[in-house]
A protein has these predicted regions:
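Conserved, well-structured core segments that form the ligand-binding/active-site neighborhood
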Residues: 108-209
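Structural alpha-beta junctions
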Residues: 63-75, 130-137, 155-162, 237-253
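ATP/pyrophosphate-binding catalytic subdomain of soluble kinases
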Residues: 191-257
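An N-terminal, globular interaction/scaffold subdomain
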Residues: 1-139
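Long, compositionally biased intrinsically disordered terminal regions
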Residues: 240, 245, 260-270
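Short connector loops at secondary-structure junctions
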Residues: 75-85, 250-262
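Residues at beta-strand starts and edge strands
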Residues: 38, 213, 265-267
Length: 270
């Protein structure tokens, strides 16, 4: 049974044993003017619940990323538990684009694999698809904690594991990652402009004034923004704790999230 995500993504189907030889053939067809210089491996993991349209959008984002940071892209599409024994299914694609900076053509390798239950053999296969002398970053999109748990040991060799808390929830980030400091939350990254704006506002006040008499801080959020809200609340708590330390003040405030977003733009602390 063809995997809907692999079926929807661009590329040509190949046998598992022919993936790397097919990649070499694709490069040969592009000619000598195609630049082949990768900086990293990017493994894009899709959970079984990701739609074909969502996968296509994330694949396009990964290709745009590769245009700035040349990489080998490996796409892993998980099958539902009911299809755990389904055979592996692969695709290969070489996406080329003009690079004005180099005045030539640059290409991105994309290897795609639909798989069932993770096994040691599957991990070994994926490892052979990676460029061994380059760092590996993992982007887990729509991957549940149960789906990623079998990959935890394998992820020890990865420099970064990134996911979106608003999609995967807190439980994903509570997994026992071998290198917790290498795990990043995309929801937190998206809030950088908000943190910068709040930081400028807070910088206009003395640290002691910010924490004096403060009883509570609540970050309210709309649907689908729980990850951003959690990251912002943690950042606020860190800032105010630092302010208390600088001013030698006592901070006795509660920090909470609220799923009932108030209307309009506002910032409230009591």
């Amino acid at each position: 049974m063809a995997h809907p995500l692999i079926d929807a993504l661009p590329g040509f189907p190949v046998k598992i044993s022919a993936v790397l030889p097919s990649l070499d053939k694709a490069w040969a067809e592009e000619g000598e003017d195609a630049a082949r210089a990768s900086q990293m491996n990017l493994v894009l993991m899709f959970g079984a619940g990701v739609s074909a349209a969502d996968a296509q959008a994330r694949f396009d984002e990964a290709i745009r990323f590769a245009q700035r940071y040349p990489c080998r892209l490996v796409v892993l599409a998980a099958r539902p538990a009911a299809e755990a024994a389904a055979p592996l299914e692969a695709k290969v694609n070489v996406v080329c684009f003009l690079d004005p900076a180099r005045r030539g053509k640059r290409c991105c390798e994309a290897l795609m694999l639909a798989h069932g239950a993770p096994t040691a053999e599957l991990e070994s296969l994926v490892s052979t698809w990676l460029e061994g002398d380059l760092p590996t970053n993992v982007w887990a999109h729509g991957v549940t904690p149960a789906e990623f748990a079998p990959w935890l040991g394998w992820s020890a060799r990865c420099r970064r594991v990134v996911a979106d808390r608003s999609l995967v929830g807190d439980a994903f980030f509570a997994l026992p990652f071998p290198h917790p400091k290498g795990v990043r939350d995309l929801a937190v990254a998206r809030c950088l402009p908000v943190r910068q704006a709040l930081g400028q506002f807070l910088a206009g006040h003395a640290p002691a004034d910010l924490v004096r008499g403060l009883r509570s801080v609540t970050v309210s959020h709309g649907a689908g923004l729980s990850g951003e809200a959690a990251g912002l609340l943690a950042w606020m708590k860190g800032c105010l704790t630092h302010c208390a330390g600088l001013s030698r003040s006592h901070l006795d405030a509660t920090f909470a999230l609220s799923a009932q977003a108030p209307s309009g733009d506002n910032l409230a602390a009591a």
